[in-house]
Amino acid sequence: MGRQRERSRPVRRDGEGMREAIRHIDSLERLKEWDAADLVNRANAIGNELSRRRMTTSQIRNFLDEVNRIHAETQGRGAEFDSSRVILLKPLLAYSAGHETNREKQEVLKSFANLFSAAADKVQDASNFKHFVDFTRAVVAYHRFYGGSNQ
């Protein structure tokens, strides 16, 4: 009976939550069209997945730190938003994935890079960037909630 119940549950393959989120992001014209409840639900699933796949807190925090730096610069001085700063996060993500020598960890970093590259492509202005920041912070929070660590 217990084995039967396990089989009836849908099995999610590694990376499936991120692939689903990428498909959803690709369907949006702008990131700000993303419903907040759906954004949080997807961030929850992705944070859990990243934790299970052993992405370290330092790897995810490095990206968040850069996102927060851009956010602070655009908020602090009333500076005009420059979307090229967000697009330039993509090479940072690629470097992080390419730098990893462990194949399993490299795969999760590539999935992470693909996810946030898709999101970065939808950031044209400050209001879209706010959704990008919210999504990034939510993924980081859920990663930590599900036990993401530095090991």
Show the residue positions of the predicted features.
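Charged, terminal alpha-helix-loop-beta segments
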Residues: 151
